[in-house]
Amino acid sequence: ITKNRKKGVGFKEYNRMLVEQNNQCAVCKTLQAGGNYNSFMVDRNPVTGDVRGLLCKNCNNALRSVGDNLHTLQSMIQYLQHYE
């Protein structure tokens, strides 16, 4: 609970978002592990600080690693498609 409250999202807001996302990561659709309040990360727009959704650790790390850069993400998709 503490981790998400530091991001300005309390228990009720977290649960509302989770219901809207069908208890899944907003990106990969992985189900929340065992109803654990801290199993998803609160994702925020790094520029505005607005809450965008709840992400699993892997998806959150992936976005952070590319710095939310759409060009980089598109290049990664093209790279993977090239080798399909």
Enumerate the language-model features and the residues they cover:
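Contiguous alpha-helical segments
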Residues: 1-41, 46-84
